[in-house]
Every structure is written in structure tokens, then in C-alpha cells.
Amino acid sequence: MARMSTNSTTPLSHIRNFSIVAHIDHGKSTLADRLIQTTGGLAEREMSEQVLDNMDIERERGITIKAQTVRLHYQANNGEKYILNLIDTPGHVDFAYEVSRSLSACEGSLLVVDASQGVEAQTLANVYQAIDNNHELVTVLNKIDLPAAEPDRIKEQIEEVIGIDASEAVLISAKTGLGIPDVLEAIVRKLPAPKSPGGEKAPLKALLVDSWYDTYLGVMVLVRIIDGVLTKGQTIRMMGTDAKYQVERVGVLTPKMVNVDSLGPGEIGFITASIKEVADTRVGDTITEDKRPTAQALPGFKPAQPVVFCGLFPVDAADFEDLRAAMGKLRLNDASFSFEMESSAALGFGFRCGFLGLLHLEIIQERLEREFDLDLIATAPSVVYKMYMTDGTERELHNPADMPDVVKISEIHEPWIRATILTPDDYLGGILKLCQDRRGIQIELTYVGTRAMLTYDLPLNEVVFDFYDRLKSISKGYASFDYTLTDHREGNLVKMSILVNGEPVDALSMMVHRTAAEKRGRDMCEKLKELIPKHMFKIPIQAAIGGNVIARETISALRKDVTAKCYGGDATRKRKLLDKQKAGKKRMRQFGKVEIPQEAFIAALKMGDE
């Protein structure tokens, strides 16, 4: 770790804190690379593509998951030296929470739009978050070296859709490095300096922006100082959890860790303070000095609530403890991921996990399988339902298998979302039909040039399964989708159980809307019929709601040719043998156990993907 003696604080007027707001793939992380390179944050040999995307998954999928930060030193054209703090944010809807934290630590944003593709749904969502945080915006059009780039049309589109002036947009190509100096100048010229109401003499007041786990240093906390000075050796107190810690190390990321003596107002840096778990550091908490606390805590963020739940089970039961340890480690870095133990008759011991959305679920599952070398089965994702019971109480339902007797429930409410979909108008018909099939309610439909912008209210239950994949396939990948949770509404929901040979299989039960139950049940039974191997007796597969069977398939029995040893001879002899076989099969059907192979579970749970 490099040592860097810096004068304790930089004047506020020479600090700029900014984040980059963009849709996936519009070149946000590449722009961050160029800014680091241009200001000399890393030597040429240390540069790698997407410096800030540390996780392998981030680089492979080309998405940013965790927000990262960098401090850049920049000498402007007017000869003054500035410190620029960049917080790179994720663009995907599931990580909107990471975005909101990063934005609250900055005063301005670069709005990056792909000059060939224009404004996308997530650009909108993140821009509105930035505007809500009173950010100044500098518009940057990226990828202008592409033959398909149309900067003038996109500028108009930005003004039309977002309603901000884009006439002075900076034109760049992050890949070739064209226009990067103009971006740096625009940051210094157009973005505001941070404000510090109390200045450095005031009691310490800092915002906890993020925390992550470092194997050598323990929990590292990213802070944005509002008032006062944070120095090494100080005893600090978290105002939300009331925990006290002694600061061991203060530093900044350039993206390398560099130790400094102190951080002053407006600066962003990290501290370590022998904190045991990331769960002890609440993002959005206010950090203050224990002896001289600040009077008023900062307005925090609301904690991220898990939206989608699913069970994760190890394929090999012996891996259960490893899975528990692995989840604990992931939880260190990702406070929005929650889990509790559960057991299933079909799949053994596992965990019920909560996620922010489907991408979050996929990424956690992939990280568990990759980084910890585990084989997992995920049950069908479900959302949180609110149940109003007949005795006047209210309960939450996370797992369809735990649903109480229907007689005791007076109403079930399910979560709804407000979705914004942007699509080229050629695909509009297909997308409208998709939303309608998913019980969507159209709120508005507007046109922006040749693209339609749809606003729909949809039940989250319908979106969780395979909505995003279907949307992408209908629109050949051109539509973009973003959503926010709105409220819970009453729904005609039923629990559909799958019975194999008369036994309910808990891992396959799901909540469905009554209108879709029959089709889902039939599909599931057909799928299981293909997947469960034949036994010596015939096996009925049924989908049932309560006591009513709504779909059924039968797997026929394998039979041994018992009459093979009779050459010619008496018909009654054959009859006797066949009757004896029939009685045996009947007995077998009563006591026989049906083995459902793991593959059948995995395939049945993926059923929505076709």
C-alpha cells in the first residue's frame, strides 16, 4: 500500500464529486478507465480493461454490480489542481439501490448516452434518481466513432425524453480516447463543488456510502465527509447502530489504496476500524466522533428490501455446511442478500434466500457455484405475498409451501410494479400482447421518434418468472425494461400443488393466478411426464388446487413378460400369471416410492424459460 503525505484537506472549491449514469453497455466503465488513464491514476502497465469491475462476473457479463470509487488528480486548463472523486455505479435495475447510495455521495453526474442507440429505460430511471438528488448533469455522447452514431438526433431525443438541455453535450469515444480532456474540463467547469455547512472546525459528520470485506484488512468502509475532519486513531460512532470503533487506517482509492493522514469536508475515502462484519455497517448511516458528536444525523437511505425469494439447495447434501459458509461470505459484501435455513422433503436441507431481483439471484447463484465450487438447485422464484387472515391478523408469505389453509385467509395481496419499456415500434404489437398476457394494465403509451415508450402496471409474480427473457426475444434484444415497486393489490391467487403418485412435492408448489393455473398445471405435468423415468407401476402426476385436480398425466408402467415361459399350453395358466402380476403391481402402487431425479427438478423449475 503506497503512502501519500497530503496536506490534511483540500479546499472545497477544488473538489468535484461525480458519478456516471448510463444504461448497460453504453460505455460507462470504459469511460471511467479513460479518465483514470488520462489523469495518471494508474501506470500504463497496471491498466486493464474495466479497471473498476473487479469481479470476474462483472467483466464477463460486461455489467457493473458493486459501485466502485476512484480519486483522480487533475490539472485544469486554468492551471489549478483539482481532486475529482468518481463513483462508478451499476446500470441494471436490480442494483438501483447501489446507484441511489452512490448518487447521494456526489453533487453531479455525467449522463452517458450511446450516440448510436440513444436513451434507454435504465438511463431514464437513473437520471431521474440523479435529478431527485439535485445533481447537476453533464451530458456525454459516447461511441461517436461508430458509423451508426447520430449525435444530433440523440441530442434532440435527450431533450425530448429527459427534458434537459443537451446542446452543449460533450462528444467522445471512450474506446479511442477521443474527447476525454473535454469531459474533464466540463466536470471542473459545470459541476458544483461540494458544500460543507459546518466546515472543518465542526464536529465530524460523514455518510457511510458503502462497505466491503477485504481478506487482509477486514471490513473497509467508504465514507463521504460532510463536516469536520476524519483522522487516524479517532474514535468514531455509527449513529444508526450506536457502535463505536477506533479508526486504524484512513485512505483514498486511486484505484489503488493509498493511505492518507486525514480526510476533510467534501472528500471521499475509506477507513478501516477492525469492524467484524459488513452487516455491522449500515449503508446510509452517519459516522460521527464519539467525544464530539454532531447534533443531527444525515437522512439515511431506506434499506434494500428483498423482492424475490427462492430456495437454494446443494445437489450433494454433504455440501450444506460449505454452502452456509459461502453465503455468509457473500453476505459480507452484499447486505441486500438475505438467507435463512429451510428443509424440503424432496431436496433436503438448504436455504431460503431473498434477492433484489432476478439478475441479483442469477449473479449470487453464479458466484456461489464459481467462487466456492458448489453445485446448486434453485427452486422456482417467488415474491412476497401479504395475507390478511380471517382472525384479523396479517402475515407475509415467502414460500408457497408454507401457505396456511385457504379457509383461514380472507385476502391475498401481491406486489405490483410500474414498468417502463422502451422499444422500436416494429415490436410494439408483440410487447403489448406479452404485457396483456401477464395481466398488465396499460398506463400510457408515448412515442419518442421511432421508439415507443410504454408504462405498464404489472404483478411482480408474472415478471419474476421469465418476463425479461421473453421481452428480449420478442424485440430481438432491442427493448429495454426498468421497474419500480409500487404497492400490494388484492389478487385472485391460488396455491398449485404438484402430486406425484398422490404425494405432494413441496419444491414444485407455486402461487399462480386462478386464470393461469390450468395452463401452468398442464405444462408442468407434461414436463414431469417426460422427465420422470418409468417404474414397475403406473404413476399419476397431478396438478391440484386444494382438493381439485386441474391437470393430470400418467406415466405407464414397465412390465415384465411373465407369460414368456409358457410354450403353447393352457390359456388359464397365462391368465393366472397375468392376474398374479396385476396383484403385485397393485401392491407396488400402494407402497412403491417414486424416485424423482434431480434433473427432473431442475428442468421443471426452468419450465418458464421456453
Swiss-Prot record:
EC number: 3.6.5.n1
GO molecular function, one term: guanosine tetraphosphate binding
Classification via InterPro entries: EF-4 (IPR006297), EFG_III/V (IPR035647), EFG_V-like (IPR000640), EFTu-like_2 (IPR004161), G_TR_CS (IPR031157), LepA_C_sf (IPR038363), LepA_CTD (IPR013842), LepA_IV (IPR035654)
Residues annotated for GTP binding in this entry: D25, H26, G27, K28, S29, T30, N142, K143, I144, D145
Gene3D superfamilies xref list: 3.30.70.240, Elongation factor 4, C-terminal domain (3.30.70.2570), Elongation Factor G (Translational Gtpase), domain 3 (3.30.70.870), P-loop containing nucleotide triphosphate hydrolases (3.40.50.300), Translation factors (2.40.30.10)
GO cellular component: plasma membrane
Localization of this protein: Cell inner membrane
Membrane topology classification: Peripheral membrane protein
GO BP term, example: positive regulation of translation
Annotated function: Required for accurate and efficient protein synthesis under certain stress conditions. May act as a fidelity factor of the translation reaction, by catalyzing a one-codon backward translocation of tRNAs on improperly translocated ribosomes. Back-translocation proceeds from a post-translocation (POST) complex to a pre-translocation (PRE) complex, thus giving elongation factor G a second chance to translocate the tRNAs correctly. Binds to ribosomes in a GTP-dependent manner.
Similarity section: Belongs to the TRAFAC class translation factor GTPase superfamily. Classic translation factor GTPase family. LepA subfamily.
Protein name, UniProt field: Elongation factor 4
Biological source species: Rhizobium etli (strain CIAT 652)
Organism classification: Bacteria, Pseudomonadati, Pseudomonadota, Alphaproteobacteria, Hyphomicrobiales
